[in-house]
Structures are given as C-alpha cells and as structure tokens.
C-alpha cells in the first residue's frame, strides 16, 4: 500500500511504503516505476520505527528516508538511491542510517536528528587538495617525508625523501623507480647516496641534486628516455680550496648568466666554473669570494635572483644581496640585511628560509618565526627597508617554509600551521588549515615546485601535497548578522513589559538607556553554519568611534561610561571561509 506521496522538482513521484527501508518512485516521462530497498540495521521491533521523510536542498540534492530507516540521496545519473552513510556491514561502518528528521539550510548544510547520535550537521565542499604518498602503509615516516621536489622538462617528478631515496614519477605520476648509484632509474639496485634537499634542472637539461652531507650531484641524461644518467659528485676537500666549501648543500640555483650556485649550511655560497683544462672549480670564500660575510653568514640555506640584477642568499643570520652581473668575484660587494631591534623597517627575523621574486618585480622573504617580509627599497649605502606581515595581519603562523607564485600573481605559502594564499595587490591572506584541507598535513622545509600544468606541489611529512590554485574557490555566501543578547551592568536583559527590551534584541531598532545604565554589552553572531568558528568580526559605534575595531572571533562588545548622546552600533563579519563581504547589522 501507498502511505503518502511526494513530487520532486523533476516531476518524479515518490511513494512511501509500509515495508521498512523500501520506497518506490515513478518517472512520468518514461512511465517506469522503480522499487528500491535500502539495508537498515536491526533494531528492537518493539521500538517505534522512524517515519518516512523526503526533502530537496539548495544544491539540488533529493534526500529520502524510507519508513523504518535507510537515509539516502538520489543519484539522477544512475536513477537510484545511494545510502548516505557507509554501506551496512562494511568494516568502517559507523553511523545509524535511521533518522527522525532532516533539514537543509540556505547554505546546503544538512542537519539530521538521528536515531542514536542526536543532532548531526553535515557540510559539503569541493576538496581541491590531495596527497601523493610514496609508501602509503607508513603515513608519517622517513619514507614519506618530502625534502625536495622538481619537475623536469619531460614532466617527470623528482621527489627527494628523507629516507635518502630519490624517487621519480612520470608525467601521470606513475612511479618509475629511484635513482641508483650507477645513474639508472630502477626499482632495484643501490640508491644514490645522499638525502636530496634541493633539485633543479638547468637550462641545458642537467639535473642538479643538493644533498645534506653528501655534496652536490650533477646528473646528465645518457638516454632519450631519461632512465639513465651520468652522475658526477662534488665534495668538499680540506686540502683543495677550489672544492665545494661544505658537503651540506641546502640549495642549488642557476642565475640569469647560466652560473650554477650552491648554498651550503656550513660554508656559505659557491658558484661553479671551469679552468683551462676543463676542471670544475668552486668559487667561494676560501678563494675569490673574499667579500662574502662568511663569519655571520656561513649557514646559507637558499639562493635565488631578483628581477633587478641581484642575487639573494637566505641564511640563519639574515639575507645577503649582491650584483649578479660581475666579472671578477674579488670585486663583488655584498650587503647583509638582518634584524635590528630599533629599526622597524629591518627584517622581522634573521632565519630566512625562502626568497621569491614576483612577476610584478617585488621580492618577498619567508622567515622561520618572523612571518613574511617584503623588500621596499635598498639605499645607496646598502641599507634595506622591509615591510613585515605576521599572524596579526592574517598569516596562520609566523613560521614560513616555502613560497610559490601562481599565474594570477598570488603567493602560496607553506607554514607550520597549514597553507595560505597572499594577495599582494590587496595585502590580504586566505588561510587553509586541516579543516579546509580535510586531512592532516605537516609541511616540510624548502620543498615545493610549480608544475607545467599549473599545479602547486609542497613537501610534507606524509607525502607530496598537491593542488591547482585555479580550482580553489572561496565561498561567496553572505551570512546575516543577528544581535543575540544584551547585558546591562553585568545583568542579562530579558524582554518584558518592565524591561528595557519590549521585544528580542534582534527585533529592537532603538534602545534607550538612562545615565546609570551606561555600562552594557551586546552579543552578536553571523549565521554561517558551515564553519562558524572561522567567522571574524568587526564593529563600530557611530557617534563615539571613528574607526572599525577588528575583534577577530570575539562575538561581543562592551562599552563603559558612554556620554549622553545618540549612537548606532554596526557590526561586520567574514563568512566561514574568511571572506570579508561587508555584511552589516545595526
């Protein structure tokens, strides 16, 4: 028998049946009647069975709960119901599919009064982030902690892992093998010695591998397939002043003149050249780079060039800059920029992890503990002026690890507390933490790359973190703001005939306070239920304040000893994605 019927937006007719877990639907265009039965868990027959329920949400989903249980959504492509929770009987089945009621709000959040769990909220979002894990069975281990990333000109991805194995994946990210000591990419054999900390491919197609403790490796392809390489390892030799200055190579870089530079963690910087006999020489502080400030800046971890003819070195004691268009290394003049306690325009922190020149010819420095620094100017006498950005400006953490620029000139920064996007034109940050990413991630130092397809790859303790910046969309939802409570002299004000409030505070347009009621608080809330803990607020009392007060996530404001007058309280908020949309209430 048919107990009730419902016609959905597409004119499909749904019939309630008295058999538990069973529902029928009729397509008037095809004349087909389909009977569906959803598996439900056993329950005591003496208990009342949950009722039939059906509704459609703002995203066009049709939700059906047959009599007795089996909460499902309708797949219009496959023309069948799909159980909302894990399949009954599967090992990870956790939830009852029996509900008493369901409701979808204006944002599409699904609210359910369930048979056993009480009230539950389900939110939906596209997840543009993914993780490529070298050894899936060991999520956070040395086998998955990424220290170096490079995409070569054939689209192969070179992945340096902390376990010392340099893995290579093809353009489809299928595992090809690892680099062996004899230069072959294979799944067998002795891995090439050394943990890769930085990898580049130069303009001639040569792969350069910076290792921690095992020097610098030059890998020149010996086959068109890119499966074999001639390897040359360069090491520090105490009795050879033209050898590599230190075996701990943290970064390798090719400048605009084709020079290869190596930043070492105990010997400053080097660049490679050759003598008349073709022998490779490393030019460093021990021979011709006499001007390099080796004593304070011997721990170099990064090197790059800007768009103004300078090379920049990131060290643990600040940044070093010099002209890259030199003829004699002895004549190079170096400028050292560091944190000066009484200079607000100096670097915010001396531990510089990453430096990036942008398309708009700006330069940004990522520090380990001092946030982001933007170069403003360098005076003729070598004094640098910087503008710093910290957690107070929207960064999720002041510990920054690496930066990449997308095709819209936004900067993507891996931090100790998630990843964020910096929009230079607006000087604004958008953060993505574990709640946005939907899985835990802990980023590694100085491991990132931008692929030819525009994908961003960042190294993490659990693998390669992957996303395409153009696929990330912030919510445009504008939440209404309501006033939720009024407190006068630390006493809650309840509406009533003898009260200050004749109606609820949110329905009150005007409030009159006497001279002895000049200490009061107002609570407010933006009705965004997706991630309400991320909503941030600002307020202003017109007639008393001239600037907005940014209250972060605080949802109340208190005023004391206001002088006589008329005032208007206005409140603004972001939505739960952190977008400031200038919603207001007064």
Label for each model-derived stretch:
Residues 1-584:
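Carboxylate-rich, polar loop motifs that coordinate divalent cations or form catalytic acidic clusters
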């Amino acid at each position: 028998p048919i107990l009730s019927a419902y016609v959905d937006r597409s004119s499909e007719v749904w019939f309630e049946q008295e058999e538990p877990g069973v529902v029928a639907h009729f397509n008037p265009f095809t004349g087909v009647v389909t009977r569906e039965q959803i598996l439900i868990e056993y329950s005591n027959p003496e208990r009342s069975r949950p009722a039939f329920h059906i509704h459609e949400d703002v995203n066009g989903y049709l939700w059906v709960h047959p009599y007795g249980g089996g909460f499902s959504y309708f797949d219009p492509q496959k023309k069948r119901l799909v159980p909302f929770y894990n399949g009954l009987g599967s090992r990870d089945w956790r939830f009852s599919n029996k509900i008493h009621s369901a409701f979808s709000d204006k944002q599409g959040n699904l609210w359910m009064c369930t048979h056993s769990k009480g009230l539950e909220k389900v939110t939906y979002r596209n997840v543009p982030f993914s993780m490529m894990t070298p050894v899936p069975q060991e999520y956070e281990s040395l086998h998955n902690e990424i220290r170096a990333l490079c995409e070569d000109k054939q689209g192969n991805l070179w992945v340096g892992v902390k376990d010392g194995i340099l893995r290579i994946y093809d353009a489809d990210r299928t595992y090809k093998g690892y680099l062996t000591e004899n230069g072959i990419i294979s799944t067998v054999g002795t891995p090439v010695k050394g943990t890769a900390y930085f990898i580049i491919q130069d303009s001639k197609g040569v792969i350069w591998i910076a290792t921690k403790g095992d020097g610098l490796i030059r890998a020149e392809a010996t086959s068109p397939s890119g499966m074999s390489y001639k390897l040359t390892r360069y090491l520090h030799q105490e009795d050879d002043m033209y050898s590599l200055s230190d075996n701990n190579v943290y970064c390798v870089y090719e400048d605009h003149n084709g020079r290869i530079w190596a930043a070492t963690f105990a010997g400053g910087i080097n660049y490679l050249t050759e003598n008349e006999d073709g022998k490779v020489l490393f030019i460093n502080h021990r021979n011709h780079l006499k001007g390099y400030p080796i004593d304070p800046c011997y721990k170099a971890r990064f090197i790059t060039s800007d768009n103004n003819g300078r090379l920049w070195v990131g060290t643990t004691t600040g940044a070093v800059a010099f002209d890259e268009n030199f003829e004699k290394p002895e004549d190079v003049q170096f400028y050292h920029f560091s944190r000066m306690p009484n200079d607000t325009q100096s670097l915010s922190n001396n531990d510089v992890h990453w430096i990036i020149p942008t398309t708009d010819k700006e330069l940004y420095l990522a520090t380990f503990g001092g946030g982001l620094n933007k170069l403003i100017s360098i005076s003729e006498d070598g004094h640098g002026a910087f503008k710093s950005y910290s957690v107070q400006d929207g960064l999720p953490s002041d510990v920054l690890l690496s930066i990449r620029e997308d095709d819209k000139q936004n900067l993507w920064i891996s931090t100790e507390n998630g990843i964020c996007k910096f929009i230079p034109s607006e000087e604004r940050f958008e953060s993505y933490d574990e709640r946005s990413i939907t899985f835990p991630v802990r980023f590694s130092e100085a491991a990132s790359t931008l692929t030819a397809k525009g994908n961003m790859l960042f190294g993490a303790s659990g693998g390669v973190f992957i996303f395409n910046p153009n696929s990330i969309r912030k919510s445009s939802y504008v939440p209404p703001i309501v006033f939720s409570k009024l407190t006068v002299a630390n006493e809650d004000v309840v509406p009533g005939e003898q009260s200050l409030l004749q109606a609820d505070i949110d329905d009150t347009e005007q409030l009159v306070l006497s001279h002895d009621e000049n200490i009061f608080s107002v609570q407010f809330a933006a009705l965004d239920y997706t991630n309400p803990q991320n909503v941030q607020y600002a307020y202003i009392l017109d007639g008393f304040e001239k600037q907005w007060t940014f209250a972060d996530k605080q949802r109340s404001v208190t005023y004391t000893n206001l002088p006589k007058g008329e005032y208007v309280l206005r409140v603004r908020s972001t939505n739960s994605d952190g977008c400031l949309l200038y919603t207001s209430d007064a």
